């Protein structure tokens, strides 16, 4: 059944969000059939989106030119978050190998990080790259709590956020005052880092980025479900647009927060949205990994970063 214009599930909670709504576009389901969709990442050269189906141990790919969907990588090592570096190489957070890896043009795989101070990482979850070459990722225990998203195991290190230098091999822990580090992204000017915490804190943190270190960490926002009377929810994957707004996978789909920490809009979805990314040839299409499906909607802004 056709959806009316404007799509009633793209909701302005504040007039400031209306500028981002395109009146004659709708939320589209591009694919369905996964068990737990995660980690969407846009490849601008190939004009495709890659995302993870964690329990099925595969990565999927959607092509922009004809909408074709296929299995991209099987097995995937139970990958979760994905991104691309500034040389176009894919980076993946792998639950199965408890590591972050990079896929080379030759087909080889380079391990970016799998141990911290001699102990195995937990289950790297989400990942972003900085123009200085640094690779930032989160490492909660979600992927080793059972056998559904990889292999049940005891954690050897505390959940944390890390920065890896792929040239030197140096791995630095930058934050560990959390039991559930999850989504991560930079502000458009790379002066701030946002961290979605799905642990006990159930909040988004914001930090000042000081070279390779995080400073002045504080609560950015604690989300609830709009219209629920205050029922709490938590952001999972997060991305920033060129105006500094945070687009967060959070019930009832996606919530949009200003750089000042004010929620202004939401996108309602029929499935739980785990993660998002901007893509398309103009970076003005929001892709949403929603449980069993991949969704997309055009918005009147652009993603701040390449993937």
Regions found by a protein language model. Name each.
Residues 15-32, 67-75, 103-118, 160-180, ...:
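Blade-edge beta-strand/turn elements of extracellular beta-propeller
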Residues 1-26, 305-307:
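Blade/loop signatures of beta-propeller domains
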Residues 58-60, 99-101, 160-162, 203-205, ...:
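A short loop-to-beta-strand structural motif that recurs across blades of beta-propeller domains
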Residues 206-214, 298-306:
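Short loop/turn segments immediately following beta-strands, especially the blade-tip
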Residues 56, 97, 151, 155-159, ...:
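A detector of repeated loop/turn-to-beta-strand junctions in beta-rich toroidal repeat architectures
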Residues 19, 44-74:
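Beta-propeller domains
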Residues 26, 32-47, 75-94, 99, ...:
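Beta-rich, blade/repeat-based domains predominating
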């Amino acid at each position: 059944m056709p959806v009316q214009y404007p799509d009633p599930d793209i909701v302005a909670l504040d007039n400031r969000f209306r500028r981002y709504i395109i009146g004659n576009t709708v939320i589209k389901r591009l694919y369905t059939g996964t068990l737990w969709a995660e980690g969407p990442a846009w490849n601008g050269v190939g004009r495709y989106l890659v995302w993870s189906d964690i329990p099925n141990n595969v990565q999927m790919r959607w092509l922009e030119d004809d909408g074709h969907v296929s299995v991209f990588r099987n097995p995937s090592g139970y990958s979760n978050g994905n991104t691309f570096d500034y040389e176009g190489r894919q980076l993946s957070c792998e639950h199965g190998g408890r590591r972050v890896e990079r896929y080379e043009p030759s087909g080889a795989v380079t391990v970016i990080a799998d141990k911290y101070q001699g102990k195995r990482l937990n289950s790297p979850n989400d990942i972003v790259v900085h123009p200085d070459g640094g690779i930032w990722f989160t490492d909660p225990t979600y992927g080793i709590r059972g056998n559904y998203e990889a292999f049940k195991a005891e954690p050897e290190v505390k959940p944390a956020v890390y920065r890896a230098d792929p040239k030197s091999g140096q791995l630095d822990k930058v934050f560990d005052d959390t039991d559930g580090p999850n989504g991560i992204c930079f502000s458009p000017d790379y002066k701030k880092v946002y961290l979605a915490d799905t642990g006990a804190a159930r909040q988004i943190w914001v930090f000042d980025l000081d070279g390779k270190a995080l400073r002045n960490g504080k609560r950015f926002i604690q989300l609830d479900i709009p219209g629920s009377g205050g029922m709490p929810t938590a952001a999972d994957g997060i991305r920033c647009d060129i105006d500094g707004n945070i687009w967060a996978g959070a019930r009832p789909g996606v919530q949009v927060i200003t750089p000042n920490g004010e929620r202004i809009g939401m996108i309602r979805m029929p499935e739980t949205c785990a993660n998002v990314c901007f893509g398309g040839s103009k970076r003005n299409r929001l892709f949403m990994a929603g449980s069993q499906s991949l969704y997309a909607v055009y918005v009147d802004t652009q993603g701040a970063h390449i993937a």
